[in-house]
Amino acid sequence: MLDMQKAQDYYGFAGGWRPQRVGGEPEEAAPGPGRDDSAQLQAGGDPQLACRASSEHLEELLEEPSHLGGEEDPWLAQASREEATRAESLAPLIAVVGGSGGVGRSSVAVLCAALAASQGIDTALIEGDLQFGDYGFWFGLDDNLPNLGDPRACPPVECTPGFSLYKAPLFPEVAEEVEDLLAEEVPRMRRGRELVIADTGGMWSGYTASLLLQCDLYLMVVDQRPSSVASALKACELCHRLKVPRTRMVVVFNRWSSRAALSAREVGRALDATHVCCIQDSKEPLDELLRCGGIEELLSSDNPAVNGARELLRQALPRVGCSFESADARRKGLFK
């Protein structure tokens, strides 16, 4: 036999109210906001009628948001904003920085961008040394091609299929004028791509800080000189003051050799890095190799710098959502 008190409690709770018991006796519950009186179950009433009334009330709430006073549901608004963000997704951004000049940032940036493109990743490279960037010379490009002298109207120059370059301005004196505009245009450059790598210059500026704040990962490049490590340490402290998460940093020991004054372990201790990626010295300047044989020939060679950059990407790209497979036939780079 149906226990009417239990049915009253159950169907009443399903309708949006719960009887309160004080001293063992249920108190009369006030109707919920906008609840039909027919849904209030009286002692001895029909539980099926209460259940049907509760279902009708639920349908009314779903169809008519009048209970919100005509205002937009904040949960729906948040979901709409998240959907819009996903629709306008930006490619991962990797910034290549260093504490001092001459550490080989440009070489590392070019190799990483070219290798990523060779794996079918649609990659753009931003030449961030706005004063003396010479990628145009490296790739044998015409000086009259579009460049970042006007970032808002600068289309990328295609170097190889899937590898595009945003060239530095032709005239060094415009660098200071365009760096703020370039920082604002970086999100546009990230749309429609799968990966964006941004080089920087020897002098840190607001543009450098903007890249670090926007990036998903940044490569801190040092070389064999103790002075480059000391400069990188100061750069790391600046990143900390900018509140750039340290987890985004990857330390790259460029031009590594067994005869270097510093070991990779010492560099890691100095910069408080668990891992240091070592890119071996290629013995020949990268720009000369590019001009002589082109990107494809360089990447297909057994150049130690190429192998080191390949291993760097194999370790780093999964952290930004890109997969990169190192060729089994090639010698891997060194992680110390």
What is each residue range found by the language model?
Residues M1-L93, D143-R152, E237, R241, ...:
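Acidic-aromatic/histidine active-site loop/patch
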Residues D223, M249-A261, I279-E284:
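G-domain G4 guanine-recognition motif of GTPases
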Residues E83-T123:
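Walker A (P-loop) phosphate-binding motif
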Residues R255, V267-E297, A309:
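Beta-strand-loop-alpha "switch" segments that mediate conformational coupling across diverse proteins
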Residues A116-L170, A175:
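Phosphate-binding loop that captures ATP/GTP phosphates
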Residues S205-P226:
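Inter-motif core of Ras-like GTPase G domains
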Residues Y166-V174, L182-S210:
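Switch II (G3) loop of P-loop NTPases
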Residues L195, L217-M220, H275-C277:
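Well-ordered beta-strand positions
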